[in-house]
Structures are given as structure tokens and as C-alpha cells.
């Protein structure tokens, strides 16, 4: 293998297959753009984003790893979220959970 080389199977690949997803309407009520990364606990994103935070607890954006979604000031859009995997514990971010979900 060459450093940085990607070895990928042939065919189609489905991200997060079999995981529970939800759709939420999100509005940027602030005066600055807000960018949210692929693995950020959506419940704890910037407070300028207005949406059902309780519904987003334990979820992240359902997008490819290493990518992000940008919300421009005044913009409203629907996003798809996917449940967090692994041990289902959240530490850090804004410190709103700091333990098991």
C-alpha cells in the first residue's frame, strides 16, 4: 500500500445503511454563516441555528465523513440526521451531555 492510497471495492456503497435517520428543518437566525462538520453532535451546534434540539439529541449529519454543511445567514433548509453509533456517549462539544445518551 502507498501512503494515502485508497483501496475501494467495486460497486455501490451506501453510507450508514440500516441506521435510524430523521429530517429536521434548520434556520440560521444569526448574521454569520455557520458550518457544521459531519461528526458534530447536532444537538450541540451553534445556538444561532434554530431547530428542534431535543429531536437532534444523539444524532449527527448524514453526510460523508470529513465533509460539512454550511448555513448562510437567514437560510432555512432541511437536513437529514443519522443516529450516533458506538458506545452512544457524547463528551465535549458544548458540554451539554457529557456522558451516555
From Swiss-Prot:
Keywords carried by this UniProt record: Cytoplasm, Hydrolase
InterPro entries referenced in this protein's UniProt entry, alphabetically: Urease_beta-like, Urease_betasu_sf, Urease_subunit
Documented EC number(s): 3.5.1.5
Places the protein is found: Cytoplasm
SUPFAM superfamilies: Urease, beta-subunit
GO MF, one annotated term: urease activity
Pathway membership: Nitrogen metabolism; urea degradation; CO(2) and NH(3) from urea (urease route): step 1/1
GO BP term (any one): urea catabolic process
Catalyzed chemical reaction(s): urea + 2 H2O + H(+) = hydrogencarbonate + 2 NH4(+)
Pfam families xref list: Urease_beta
GO cellular component terms given for this protein: urease complex
Quaternary structure note: Heterotrimer of UreA (gamma), UreB (beta) and UreC (alpha) subunits. Three heterotrimers associate to form the active enzyme.
PANTHER family: UREASE
Family stated for the protein in its record: Belongs to the urease beta subunit family.
NCBIfam families: PRK13203.1 (NF009682), urease_beta (TIGR00192)
Protein name: Urease subunit beta
Gene: ureB
Amino acid at each position: 500500500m502507498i501512503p494515502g492510497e485508497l483501496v475501494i471495492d467495486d460497486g455501490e456503497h451506501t453510507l450508514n445503511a440500516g441506521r435510524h435517520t430523521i429530517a429536521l428543518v434548520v434556520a440560521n437566525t444569526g448574521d454569520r454563516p455557520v458550518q457544521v462538520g459531519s461528526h458534530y453532535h447536532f444537538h450541540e451546534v451553534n445556538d444561532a441555528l434554530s431547530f428542534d434540539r431535543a429531536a437532534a439529541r444523539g444524532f449527527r449529519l448524514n453526510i460523508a465523513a470529513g465533509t460539512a454543511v454550511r448555513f448562510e445567514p437567514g437560510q432555512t433548509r432541511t437536513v437529514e440526521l443519522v443516529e450516533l453509533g458506538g458506545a452512544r456517549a457524547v463528551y465535549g462539544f458544548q458540554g451539554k451531555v457529557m456522558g451516555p445518551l
